[in-house]
Amino acid sequence: SILVMGAIDTDTLYDRLMNTFEWGRMNEEDVHLDYYTIRTMSVIRFRSLYTRLAMELLKEGKRERAIDVLNRCMELAPSRVLPFDQYVTGITLPTKDGGIIHHEGIIEAYYLCGETGKANQILSEHYQNLSQEILYYNAMKPGHRSSIQREINEAMFQLEELRILLENFQQEELMLELGISDFDS
C-alpha cells in the first residue's frame, strides 16, 4: 500500500538531506518555481521526507537533530516557495480493515519536538491561507464550484486536520484567535 511507508536509516537520510542533496537556490527571493517544479516537489513528497526523518530522530531521542531537520525543511521550502499542503497538516486515513493510518505533518512534528511557537506560526499561516481559499471558492457560481470540488474538499479536510492539531496539542488560545471556538465539533 502507498500509505504504509518502509523503515529509514536515520544516519544515512540525515546526512543526505542535511549535507549531500543540493536544492539550488529555490528558497531565495529572486527565484520563482514554475508549476512543474512545484508539482515535482509534491510528487517526491519533499516535506514528508524531512518530517519522517524528524519523527524517527525523535523516536531515537535525538530531539535537537529532529528540530534541525524541520528547520532545514522550512528554510528550503517556506510557503512562498512551496505552497503548504497535506504534508504540513498531516494525513489521517481509514484503512481497508477498519483501522486508521496516520502520517504526521511538519506542524505536528514541531509540536512533538516542543517547538510550539514554530508549530503555531505555520499552523496559523496555513489556516489563514485555507480560509481565504474557501472564501474564494464560495464566491464562485455553483456551476464553477462543482468543477473544483476536489480542491474544496482538500481545503476542508486540511482545515479539519488543523482543528484536530489545535485540540490535540491544547492550543485553546490560538483556536480562539483563529475563530475556532468549538472544541467538541
What label would you give each PLM region?
Residues 1-185:
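C-terminal luminal/periplasmic domains and tails of membrane-associated envelope-modifying transferases
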